[in-house]
Amino acid sequence: MSIQRGVVSSWSAVGARPVRVSATEPIALVLVSNEVDDNKMFYFDSVDKALMHFIEAKEVNGKMRTLSDMKAGIADGSIKGNLFKYLVWTTNKYEIVVPTVISVAKYSEDEAELKTNIINAIASIRYAPSKFKVHPDIIGVADYTTDIDIANQYIATIHLLRARGFIDLKATDGSEAKAKRKEFGSERVTPLYTNLKDWNTLTDSVDEYSANYILSIFRCVVDASDTVKQVGWSFSLSNKTLPVSDAVGDVDFVLGLGDETDFLTQNQITSFIEFKGIRVWNYQTCSADPLLQDARRVRIFDKLSFAVLDAIFPFIDSNKGVKAVREAKATIKNFVMDMIGKEVLIGGEIELDENLTTPNAINDGKFYFKVNTQENPVPTLIGVEFNRVDSYSEIVYKTINS
């Protein structure tokens, strides 16, 4: 039909757009293996698929390797590195179905060469978004972040990707932990007091595991734990149990009294306590800014700001003009209300920032909004005081005289 005469119809979508925060953020893991010719980065849809890939990468007597073959290879020294140790542990404990980037550092007997390979493997993760079209939100490095040079590259990569991670302090006491923790200052990194112990099914023995790696995996598990509201990404890791047998370093924890964990908490160090299982205790960053020391708070506002970017992108260069800006504002407002309803936030408001949205800015098509909001606080201390009084003596009289 002609568009000049007759009936013409069309439709358009008007109003706020939905904003979604993913509960299954990609994870990047740096592991070491002698089964690669050079450093190499891989992508998998899950950790299980990653493990199967590396098992099937080589054959034994013309057949696909089994876990028994892996155990034999580790025992005779033909398999070196920590790749299988950690991937097998992960698949034994959890089903991690998230986009998974594995950056493999080539194993070397030369410690300096191995260190260089690990640093390069960490640095290469910055290219994961362009290579695999995924943006790692969590980065884990098994075993090696106690080295200051490796730790610095790790933190630099985390900041480049606006991700988050953990640092293994591997301390023997609180004083050493405090000294090591002072070497770092980042709102995206959580220092960990000591490593963890668990049964290694590949060596049939108790083994030491990097707390950095285990908490990186655990962060994914907690993210996916809320299947109803899907806001597990806003949960703290503190006071949650880990599927491990023990911590390498004992920390005195006395419920209701002062103990060793208080000193560690005051110095923004996460520890592990034994209370009805092995639990994560404290979840802070090592930032110097008090407002950025709550790792949960940092993650919440990170995720909110990222989610809004995708939602308001369609309004850029819109032919609707100022109506598009109004719809963008409605989109952000509805998102904040949704987060309040899901108890991630306790309140919030959005307004046009007129100090920045000047007449000149409007002429250039630039509009600025301020969102004033607060995260739902997590109780870290609940004090209870019992006071002995005699104001209930009347009950005694009534009991005797009844």
Residue ranges and their predicted role:
Residues 291-356:
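Acidic, low-complexity glycine/serine/threonine-rich segments
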Residues 37-44, 48-95:
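N-terminal assembly/attachment segments of tailed bacteriophage virion structural proteins
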Residues 2-22, 26-36, 41-45, 55, ...:
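A glycine- and small-residue-enriched flexible loop/hinge signal that marks low-structured segments
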Residues 69-76, 88-120:
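Acidic/glycine-enriched edge-of-secondary-structure segments
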Residues 356-402:
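C-terminal edge-of-domain segments
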Residues 153-154, 328, 350-351, 383-387:
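Composition- and surface-driven signal marking solvent-exposed, interaction-prone regions
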Residues 56, 259, 334-338:
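Short, intrinsically disordered, mixed-charge
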Residues 4-5, 148, 326, 330, ...:
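Conserved structured core elements
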